[in-house]
Structures are given as C-alpha cells and as structure tokens.
Amino acid sequence: MQQNPHTHAAPGAARPVLRGVRRRLAAVTAAVAAVLVLGTLTGPGAQAADNPYERGPAPTESSIEALRGPYSVADTSVSSLAVTGFGGGTIYYPTSTSDGTFGAVVIAPGFTAYQSSIAWLGPRLASQGFVVFTIDTNTTLDQPDSRGRQLLAALDYLTGRSSVRGRIDSGRLGVMGHSMGGGGTLEAAKSRPSLQAAIPLTPWNLDKSWPEVSTPTLVVGADGDTIAPVASHAEPFYSGLPSSTDRAYLELNNATHFSPNTSNTTIAKYSISWLKRFIDDDTRYEQFLCPLPRPSLTIEEYRGNCPHGS
C-alpha cells in the first residue's frame, strides 16, 4: 500500500513551527502595544506619570509657534451685567474634558482699549491647554492698580461662578495684560502671591519696583516703544523683581508699544512656554527658556535666571 508522506508526522515535528508562530504573535503584540503607547504619548491628553498637570503632547519649536495647539477651543461671552468688579469678557476653553482640569489665565487690555485688542491670545493660548479669559475693564481709563484688582476679580469669577469653573484647577492660575493692563498684572501678582505666573506685555506703571512679587514673571518690552519706553518701564520692572523670583525680560526687536495687539509669534511662543512651565509645572517647556534665548530678528534682548527654581 502506498504511504502518504504528509501524514503521521513525528510527535516533536510541530514544535518548531508552533514556537515560530508564538514568536511572530509576540512580535505583533509588542508592535501593537508600542503603537498604543506612542499614541498615548503624542495625543492631546498625553500626561507624564510624575506630573499630573502636564497637558498635551511633548512640545517642539514648531508646536509652540503654531497658530493653534492640539486642543479644539470653544468660547463663551460674559456680560458686564452678570459680574462685579470688572467689565465682562470672553472665555476661551479646550472642549476636551478627558484630560481633567486646566490652568487658567486672565488677560487685561491697556489704557482706552477693549478686550478686542488682546483677543488673539484667547484661542491661541487655550488651544495649548488653558482656560483663558480676556476681559474688559470697568472703564477704559482705569489705572494699573484698578486693573490689577479687576484681574483678580475676573479670576475669582472664573473659578467660582463661571459656566466653565468645573474645567479649571483653581490652584493653577496666572495673569497677563497689555500696557496699563501689564502694569495691572504686576499689581495683581503683588496682591496675590499664590498666582503661578504673570506676563506683563509692554507694561506701563508709575511704580517701578516690585520687591513683594514672588510669582514667576516674564516682562515683555519692545525696543521701539515710545509710550512705555523700556528704559523707564519694562526694564526697571524686571530689575525691581527680587532675584529670588523666577523672572525673565524679553525685549522684542523691531517692535512697538502696540505689538501685543496683533498676532505675534514671539510673544505667543514665550508666553506659552512661561505659562506651561509655571502654571502646569511642565518642565518639558524649560528647553525654550533655558539656556536663555539669544538675540535674533525678533528678539532684541533676553535676560533671566536659569535654571528656574519653581
């Protein structure tokens, strides 16, 4: 009788084949796991295990210079009739709720100006993972000390009564402002040392020394500013901060007092880095602040203390 050579194989003959299949399955499983992990690390909700406040994927030069970050953004208007202590405004916030709460920033306009003058910062910062409130002041003629109080009143409304309060970590807050709003930013940081970040943009204030400020502060001046010249405003503000405070001075090149009123990549880049570093305690952004940025086509000068202590 003719025998079939493909039947009745020896008992151990299948083992190498099975081992090969198992190895291939293990390799595929590992590859899938790697893809899943990579997706987790690079998606909008990526967070490092040792810092629960990190939001968004690892930053790059291009990501912090982009017009929009990884988060989709919505906005809601706040009527001046619905609030006390400031003039209402617009809240910009990430639509995602899967990442937990976000830090928040309130931004005040300058003398005679409205929130529209700094509105570009709202979606730009919010898309990087912040709740941002651009406000109007009670009157356009309000002075820096009044604007400082209004920034704090807006923060209190944002965290206590606003429709997005559940999206905010009330322990991670910052302030920004332009011109007299920038002077108000320093006033707010002086009054409330629990603030995590302050960014005065081409600031104006009659008070030149700020020894009481312990909040990490980035002062932004402009080399062509004739309304608040850096020699009598931004530079002494920076120098008047305690050396123990995390501080930096960024002087824009070929810029004016009104440069913060239109979309500006340099302002956005370093504001995002400062807010991320100190509100989110996200050291992934330290690389853009330390070593100190060098003079360039957009930077006239940059000073600061590195590495940062906070």
Curated annotation (Swiss-Prot):
Gene, per the UniProt record: bdeA
One GO CC term, this protein: extracellular region
Tagged with keyword Signal: yes
Deletion phenotype: Deletion of this gene results in reduced BHET degradation.
Free-text function comment from the UniProt entry: Catalyzes the degradation of bis(hydroxyethyl) terephthalate (BHET), a derived-oligomer of the plastic poly(ethylene terephthalate) (PET), hydrolyzing BHET to mono(2-hydroxyethyl) terephthalate (MHET). Shows no activity against PET.
Protein name per UniProt: Bis(hydroxyethyl) terephthalate hydrolase
Organism whose genome encodes this protein: Streptomyces coelicolor (strain ATCC BAA-471 / A3(2) / M145)
Keyword Hydrolase: yes
pH influence on activity: Optimum pH is 7.0.
